């Protein structure tokens, strides 16, 4: 697995990294992913309103990010086993779970999107940091 900045980055706030995925190179738009993670981790204020449409939009975006990052991380760590691959397997199963409907259960949906954002943050580090087969992944997986 190689990750490297790509010449495709055109603006200072548009860092991109090419990573080896299971089906070939994948370009990861780091700042865009980080912005979606930040949106998923936005605090829910007690008594404040939760916009179900916004939660649904952020959830859908983070699910796409998680699927892409997970595929790259699985390809990168497939031969290493251990804690990392156990966490990746667990996250793969969790992505298949049905999430709460934000219109019916907005607080539960907001908590789920925050959990998904934390998982994306961990995956982003796994695919952009140097490979460490002894890495212990502490997350909510």
Name each region found by the language model:
Residues 63-112:
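Amphipathic protein-protein interaction modules
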Residues 2-31, 121-141:
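Short, charged, intrinsically disordered terminal tails
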Residues 2-19, 54-79:
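Long, acidic, intrinsically disordered low-complexity segments
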Residues 17-29, 46-61, 83, 101-115:
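Non-transmembrane, amphipathic alpha-helical segments
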Residues 40-51, 73-80, 98-105, 127-134:
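Secondary-structure edge/capping motif, primarily at the C-terminal ends of alpha-helices
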């Amino acid at each position: 697995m190689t990750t490297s900045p790509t010449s495709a980055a055109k603006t200072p706030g548009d860092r991109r990294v090419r990573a080896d995925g299971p089906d070939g190179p994948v370009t990861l738009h780091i700042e865009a992913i980080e912005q979606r993670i930040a949106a998923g981790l936005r605090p829910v204020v007690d008594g404040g309103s939760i916009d179900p449409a916004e939660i649904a939009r952020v959830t859908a975006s983070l699910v796409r990010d998680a699927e892409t990052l997970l595929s790259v991380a699985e390809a990168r760590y497939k031969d290493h086993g251990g804690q990392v691959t156990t966490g990746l397997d667990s996250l793969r199963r969790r992505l298949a779970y049905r999430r709460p409907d934000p219109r019916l259960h907005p607080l539960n949906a907001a908590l789920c999107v925050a959990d998904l954002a934390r998982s994306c943050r961990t995956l982003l580090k796994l695919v952009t940091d140097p490979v460490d087969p002894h890495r212990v992944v502490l997350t909510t997986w």
